[in-house]
Amino acid sequence: MAVKPHGGTLIDRVLKGPAREEALKRAKELPRLFLDRWEASDLELIANGAFSPLAGFMNKADYENVVDNMRLADGTVWTIPIVLGVASGEAGSLAPGREAALCAEDGELLGLIKVEEIYDYDRRREAEKVYKTTDEAHPGVKRVYERAQYLLGGEISLISRRRPGQFPEMYLDPSETRRIFAEKGWKRVAAFQTRNPIHRAHEYLLKCALEICDGLFVNPLVGETKSDDVPAAVRVECYNVLLSRYFPADRVFLSAFPAAMRYAGPREAVFHAIVRKNYGATHFIVGRDHAGVGSYYGAYDAQLIFDNFEPEELGITPLFFEHAFYCRTCGGMASRKTCPHGGEDRVFLSGTRVREMLSAGEMPPEEFTRREVAEVLVRYYAK
């Protein structure tokens, strides 16, 4: 039996047929709000059910409960605010109970929102609670501080879907991945979230998960990330070359997660798990410093946060892993749970050192990354 969506029902707010045509007509007479890429991706992920049980951008009660208690107003576990900012000038044209058209930055109509409420909020409080810092150098905090003056809550409907030019076949809705897992006969599905190329340490975690699950769902985030993160197209090439050569084809499935990266560390780990549950996963891999950035979070804070919730509240099983490394004496990948040897036997490379090597055209050691993956990255850094 497939895992139930979060909240019990997979949301579908994508308009089709006559309902879509009618919405297109209404939109011509409505006030227009322009969404940036982050908000547009949230709109689509609400509509296709990835953010179930949300049916729209959060109202004040849900927003404040999520910020303070990591739950929606009805008690459902939810850790990240999903909100739509609106400037004071725009707010004047809106009224509760009325609709507004939601448009992309280039003016394309994306959908509609039925305005429930327009409310003020405390940016600093959100930063402290959600990101554990008020430092504007944190990319998530910076985003909060730059957001518009008010927030707009209300149910949405999606009219137009924007498919990217790159790897459109990888963009699947939760209803589609759930069907695929069922067709494959997978009852236990381990999901893996990543915004980086997969190196040997990640490969080790994935194969450990595959030992206890029927299938592996590799679901890289391909929405907005930091400017110095490896671009999605390069990462997808890395994923394809690794999975095709070092994993059984019938036990792994690769699909894109078109969300923006929040860099909210522990809270985002829970959020990522819930979303993958909606995609049909039963287990979720949580490694060292999941969704972290800089030194804002402890190495295993993203695992400890799960202690705040009962297993039945989450409905997905987290798989916690220690930081993995190659041990020369063991002759393979290990962690401090399985390896008795000292630091001199362990191959560790910092991200900074790896980028320096790749930029210089040097191949990182095989103990750190597969040669095929390194070759893709060397070509990218050589540009």
UniProtKB/Swiss-Prot annotation:
Broadest EC class assigned to this enzyme: transferase
Any GO BP: hydrogen sulfide biosynthetic process
Any Pfam family hit: ATP-sulfurylase
Keyword Transferase attributed: yes
Gene behind the chain: sat
GO molecular function: ATP binding; sulfate adenylyltransferase (ATP) activity
Catalytic reactions of this protein: sulfate + ATP + H(+) = adenosine 5'-phosphosulfate + diphosphate
Keyword tags: ATP-binding, Nucleotide-binding, Nucleotidyltransferase, Transferase
EC number: 2.7.7.4
Pathway: Sulfur metabolism; hydrogen sulfide biosynthesis; sulfite from sulfate: step 1/3
Stated name of the protein: Sulfate adenylyltransferase
Natural source organism: Pelotomaculum thermopropionicum (strain DSM 13744 / JCM 10971 / SI)
Family classification: Belongs to the sulfate adenylyltransferase family.
